[in-house]
Amino acid sequence: FYTRIWETNGTTVTSQVVNMEMAAEYLNNHGIEKQWDEETCQNYGEYQSGNSYFQVWLEDADSIRVKLSVMDQYQIGGVAEWRLGLEEPMVWEVIAEYMSRN
């Protein structure tokens, strides 16, 4: 459970890994309103500062809920996450809700 804050400056693209809480704080601290991106099924935020353009696709309870529904749709037997401990508590509530139905 993690995401990246992407920075594009000219032709240079860099990123930093952040946990779910840090990503939400980043959006809040920079006055970025997240919007649902139908293509990626994730909340998304962006802003520009000087010559840099910043983008964040959020892995959060909303996106996890969609991923779990895809598991149902395609009868996928399980899911893996990159690293435990980077998630928000709400994610476990979404997973528990999914598990109680299946």
PLM feature spans:
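Glycan-binding loop/region signatures in secreted carbohydrate-active enzymes
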Residues: 1-70, 99-101
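Conserved, mostly hydrophobic/aromatic
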Residues: 71, 79
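Conserved residues at the C-terminal ends of beta-strands
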Residues: 82
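Short acidic, glycine/proline-enriched helix-loop-strand junctions
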Residues: 88-102
